[in-house]
UniProtKB/Swiss-Prot annotation:
Methylates ribosomal protein L11. This is Ribosomal protein L11 methyltransferase. It comes from the Bacteria. Its EC number is 2.1.1.-. The gene is prmA. Keywords: Cytoplasm, Methyltransferase, S-adenosyl-L-methionine, Transferase. One of its GO terms (cellular component) is cytosol. S-adenosyl-L-methionine binds at T145, G166, D188, N230. InterPro entries: Ribosomal_L11_MeTrfase_PrmA, Ribosomal_PrmA_MeTrfase, SAM-dependent_MTases_sf. GO terms for biological process: methylation. Belongs to the methyltransferase superfamily. PrmA family.
Amino acid sequence: MPWIQLKLNTTGANAEELSDALMEAGAVSITFQDTHDTPVFEPLPGETRLWGDTDVIGLFDAETDMKDVVAILEQHPLLGAGFAHKIEQLEDKDWEREWMDNFHPMRFGERLWICPSWRDIPDENAVNVMLDPGLAFGTGTHPTTSLCLQWLDGLDLNGKTVIDFGCGSGILAIAALKLGAAKAIGIDIDPQAIQASRDNAERNGVSDRLELYLPKDQPEAMKADVVVANILAGPLRELAPLISVLPVEGGLLGLSGILASQAESVCDAYAELFTLDPVVEKEEWCRITGRKK
């Protein structure tokens, strides 16, 4: 069926409140997108996180009277009469069927497979993560997710605690648990991502070892042996002071969602507190890893 998309711009601090306003006005789903960076879509919007300049996008049924929606939103104190927005009619397409047909089991590193829950497992003896992320969250198909999964596969995670900052479908946190981590913590600004992560954790039998939080609910003074953040260069730079305190001394950090051309500026934001490894590139994207000093 066709859909109507309403996009408005705000700050990261207000994104969650305006997301609630769009849902109350009738939106069936919400996407957060960095205004300035190229967003990471896997395979549709939904992977981006909390940053300074944010587009909040609401998806509405094609029969929705958008004049009524705008009138409702104009009553919100963060918007007001005549607030800037863009309304767009989306193509009528069976997104779910097309997405499912093109999502196949994928291998990352030596041990790890990501398998759609509706397909057969290629290797019963491998570390298999069964994934049903829905339309809006990570599946492993994007180079940045692949880079993170390969990195996790190469680590000794036995008994470790892992934080997945911007968890989306939970793919990285769940992979870490299946690879031996004792505990994982997923953080995401999008409530739908939290639910998708919870569902996927139950599907993989690791829900008892995965904690999930919206940023406003996360515990203070969280620490982990390994921290991975697959978001975008803009928020990685902006949130460097927050992300940098999460690894313990000697802990590991993995960052992606970064174009190769942006690597230097992201490295600069973390170099003071981390001993950084050589940047690893895949296609036009890259991964930055390091150890806490």
